[in-house]
């Protein structure tokens, strides 16, 4: 059970990448799909309701979580926190390069905000909650969600949010109710996007839907963690940086050769699912030999000044309180994919 705690986070990160992939597929096909085809139009709107603006917040939240775990890892190795500056610099560089391929890049923003968070990373959870909540309220209007979501991810680790699922079960069940409610409000806002209130409603609904996804995924994982699909999500999550970049490369190549001009919305979804399935397969094979993905390992090399690709090892350890999501996992598995 201890190992499953971090696997939940890896699986959730992999799940978020699936949603991001589907959302980006619609974005790449925007303007190229035949709008006169009612089927195309309806499916595009359904995908927008399910994915747009609701999976990237999960990915961002987990980045904040991973940042704290990275700090803990550095401390265990008696490394100074300043090595995080090296990692952030590499992420900014990678993000800048990624921006040349995809205007929706988030890595550059993640790297820059990662620098800023170093000044408050040791603050008490109460301070982080106050700052995060204030920024979150502003983000509803400004749509600048990255910083508050980072902070909430950091707070989640510091507060051991998921320590006792049984005692908090009722809250997760209530969280699941957000899914149907916010999908309805997202649909209304998308159908009336020209109205001034629709953007505000869309931003709020998208974030609340992300919370619903997190609670639903956590509950399902808790009850059915042995299902093969969670292992696939986990492997994608452990190599999330590599897979995120590869998704962009594949989509850019497809766009350049005119693939999106000949596919309808249904075909586009199947292509996205095929890409994700291949990534699951390749990631699973790769992780049988190595502990980290290619890009993940490159960041580690620069961070720890270690140029040897280490093969997979199983050395369990315990940190702090026991907790079904966060503690007592193999060392390599605990560190951030980004």
Where are these regions (language model features)?
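Alpha-helical transmembrane segments and their immediate juxtamembrane cytosolic regions
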Residues: 1-326, 332-338
